[in-house]
Amino acid sequence: MKQKEKNITLRNAQQMVDEWIKTYGVCYFSELTNMAILTEEVGEVARIMARRYGDQSFKENDKNKSLGDELCDVLWVLLCLANQTGVDLEEAFKENIEKKTNRDKERHINNSKLHKNESEK
């Protein structure tokens, strides 16, 4: 399974995951199992974030964990769930951006809490 494209779309990513599952993974885990795995993977991202950007220090065996790799594990399971439930993430993402834009186009610009550094100058 070779991916020659430099830029991978969400649709390509969904297809790549599906091909990988069918070639190497035998079949998808159940949706509920994948939801539990997603929760586990998000926890691994949280662990890195808490140690890298928060107040906790790394445990010796966690020092070399890659945030990018853990984020990709989250993305992988999201892509699996989308494939299993028939969600085209590319279309859903476009619709979601439009929804957010319509709902929030002025909300954040008018939020004085987000401009606190400007008022301190």
Each language-model region and where it sits:
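Flexible "arm" and connector segments at domain edges
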Residues: 1-71, 75-121
